[in-house]
């Protein structure tokens, strides 16, 4: 820009304190393929001793996190499965075919030789209690990740019911925010939870698979932008490629480019990638709603207009370029609501000629009344082809037809019980 006051060129810059996201592949490239590190405190304590300390702490509400981490590590060390094939992620050898691995094969483990912390022990506990005690302790992770009181209450009801199924006189787990709220800020406890979940995600029939009740929130943590894509595919019935064809806003497209950065194993269910945050592989997720606010908002606007409860309750994280993103979402939701993609799955024997006509392309009937009476716009596209719709909108200076706007306003009026600061609340407020 040229300033007429001082007759000089100035460079306009926007202040920002945003930290660039870190892709999981960068961790392994920069670390020469080394595994993430797990540090385990209280190295002098054996399993029977630390089990008694943990059970005593649970009974009295005096749990020591260092004891918990040591206990969960020792239990996980004894949980093994044989691999049917090589397990490799980002070039890291987690295990080879026919190898027995345990929960900690994902880490370089460092056992710390720190001073032993004492506590009140309970002697009425043995290895048979490990199945529910592990569940109870890992459930603190999930409780700590939930900010919703009602959600935590429901989790506790289910958790305590499960625990009582293993041991009738087991202590009740309570909603102690000070405890579970602080535990989830401890990086080693989060790595413990991630290790259990990554292992049980592969070995779903393991005796300890039920502990995922407490650890499942570790998988795809801070990946709401990426997960929104998968959810949108479910709601719309479109493939990811077909969804991308409907993106008419540059900011949304830029977010997709971020998400689709190659080499990050987002399509590998057994990769380190879903656990990159809790395992310390990334300092800032490139897949979060904060890193990709435009695609996240766009997809959940579409989902909400198509009556998805999950999208309705999705957080409203950004208002950047919201008008354009909203108009793009209006078009997509209108088309998906009014133009079905149906297939005749079964045919009577006498109707087989229909299949041949379809293959020959000789049955292309179209609805002649689709365009309506909107003379200013001309005929709206009769198909659900994104290119046709974009050309139509472009030719009309991207002013939405009344038919589209009226449909979306009607859908917005139907939204009820939307929580504050959510996509649903925003749409309900614009009518």
From Swiss-Prot:
Residues 361-377 have a biased composition (Acidic residues). This is Nucleoprotein. The gene is N. It is found in: Virion; Host cytoplasm. InterPro entries: Rhabdo_ncapsid, Rhabdovirus_ncapsid_C, Rhabdovirus_ncapsid_N, Rhabdovirus_nucleoprotein-like. The lineage of its organism: Viruses, Riboviria, Orthornavirae, Negarnaviricota, Haploviricotina. It comes from Bovine ephemeral fever virus (strain BB7721). Residues 352-379 are annotated as: Disordered. Its main location: virion. One of its GO terms (cellular component) is viral nucleocapsid.
């Amino acid at each position: 820009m040229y300033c007429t006051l001082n007759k000089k060129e100035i460079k306009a810059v926007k202040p920002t304190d945003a930290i660039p996201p870190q892709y999981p592949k960068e961790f392994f490239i920069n670390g020469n393929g080394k595994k993430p590190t797990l540090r385990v405190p209280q190295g002098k304590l054996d399993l029977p001793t630390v089990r008694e300390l943990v059970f005593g702490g649970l009974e009295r509400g005096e749990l020591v996190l260092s004891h918990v981490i040591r206990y969960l590590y020792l239990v996980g060390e004894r949980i093994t499965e044989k691999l049917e094939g090589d397990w490799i992620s980002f070039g890291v050898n987690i295990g080879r075919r026919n190898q027995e691995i345990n929960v900690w094969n994902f880490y370089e483990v460092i056992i710390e030789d720190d001073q032993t912390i004492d506590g009140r022990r309970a002697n009425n506990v043995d290895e048979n209690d490990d199945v529910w005690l592990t569940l109870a302790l890992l459930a603190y992770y999930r409780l700590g990740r939930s900010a919703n009181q009602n959600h935590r209450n429901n989790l506790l009801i289910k958790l305590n019911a499960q625990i009582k199924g293993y041991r009738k006189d087991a202590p009740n787990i309570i909603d102690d925010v000070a405890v579970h709220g602080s535990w989830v800020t401890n990086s080693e406890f989060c790595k413990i939870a991630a290790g259990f979940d990554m292992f049980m995600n592969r070995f779903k029939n393991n005796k300890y698979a039920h502990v995922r009740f407490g650890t499942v929130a570790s998988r795809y943590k801070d990946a709401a932008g990426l997960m929104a894509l998968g959810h949108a595919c479910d709601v719309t019935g479109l493939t990811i490629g077909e969804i991308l064809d409907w993106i008419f806003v540059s900011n949304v497209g830029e977010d997709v480019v971020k998400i689709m950065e190659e080499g990050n194993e987002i399509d590998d269910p057994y990769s380190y990638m879903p656990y990159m945050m809790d395992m310390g592989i990334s300092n800032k997720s490139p897949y979060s709603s904060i890193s990709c606010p435009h695609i996240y908002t766009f997809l959940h606007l579409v989902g909400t207009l198509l009556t998805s409860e999950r999208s309705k309750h999705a957080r409203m994280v950004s208002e950047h370029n919201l008008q354009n993103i909203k108009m793009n979402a209006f078009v997509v939701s209108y088309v998906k609501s009014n133009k079905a993609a149906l297939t005749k799955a079964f045919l009577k024997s006498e109707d087989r000629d229909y299949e041949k006509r379809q293959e020959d392309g000789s049955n292309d009937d179209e609805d002649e009344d689709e365009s309506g009476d909107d003379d200013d716009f001309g005929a709206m596209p009769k198909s659900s082809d994104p290119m046709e719709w974009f050309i139509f909108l472009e030719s009309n200076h991207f002013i939405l037809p009344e038919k589209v706007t009226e449909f979306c306003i009607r859908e917005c009026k139907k939204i009820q019980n939307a929580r504050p600061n959510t996509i649903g609340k925003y749409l309900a407020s614009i009518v």
